[in-house]
Amino acid sequence: MQFTHNISGMRWVARDAPVGSKIYSATSTGIAGPGFALNCDNDGSLALTANMGTPLPVAPGTFPPVDGKDVTGKVLQTSIPGVGLYLELGGFLNGTASNTFQANDGGIGAVPYVGENQRNMAPTPLVMRNLIIKYMALIKTGPIPAGISSFSQEVVRGVVSDVGDAVRLTLGGQVQQAQCTVKADAVSANPVQLGTHDIADFTGQGSTTNPVDFFITLSDCEDDPAGSVARAFMRLDGVDGSVPVDRDLGLFTLTTDSTAAGIGIQVLRSDNTPVKLEEYVDMVGLTPGITRLDLRARYYQTAATVTPGEAKGALNFTIEYR
């Protein structure tokens, strides 16, 4: 009996989502059969089996639970690099009634498994016309190619006692990564001009100048138009001698070629909350096309005395999509 099911729609996953992230899941999926039935009967004296095997390799390594399910050792590698499939069967191939097989993994029915029946099926024998997928999930197993990736392949080959090759299931679907590009002119002003200030503008440690707005543009953003699945995370690291003064405050030193002293530079979000340094910070959900990271920067007095001169700072930024 040949069964075929296509997962509807494009399934999106953030480019830098960790291995083990769920891309898609569904429960209680019924698939119509080819128009004839698989018939089995048992008076309890026979041990009938339904060996639900798979031609797909098992993805190596351990995975975190998905929807509370232990999937390690049962994630099947699809033809899309980095995309695995976890599949539980139900219905006649894995149930609790006397006229069903019961999976030998405690009734979970995670492919591959062997279903067993040694019970009296009377008064109703097993008559299987349709296939039930109790639960399925697409799971990230590694790097996924950019662009649209498709799969359509046989995922289950079932051998049933006295019948032989009895059940085959083909699944198909499409997966695309959510991501953007960072162009050379991504920063609205580079360098960001923080202005010229008098020594009198600094009234003591912790005093600041007025913040200057700037932004970083993420271009060519691709994400689910029905609702973003990815968020942009940004990491800021000092270069050219700029190092953190207070990571949590987003405060860093001037560059080594600066001649001013006693001040640093602070990076803020548009709402004036600090952007932490040297760690990835959740900034914003992706918008298809253009996504903008709105930021501000200002001078921040770090010492009791401020020495006038040129005051420069330098940071590198790195973006991940999770």
Question: What is the meaning of each model-derived region?
Answer:
Residues M1-R322:
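Mature extracellular/passenger domains of Gram-negative fimbrial/pilin and adhesin proteins
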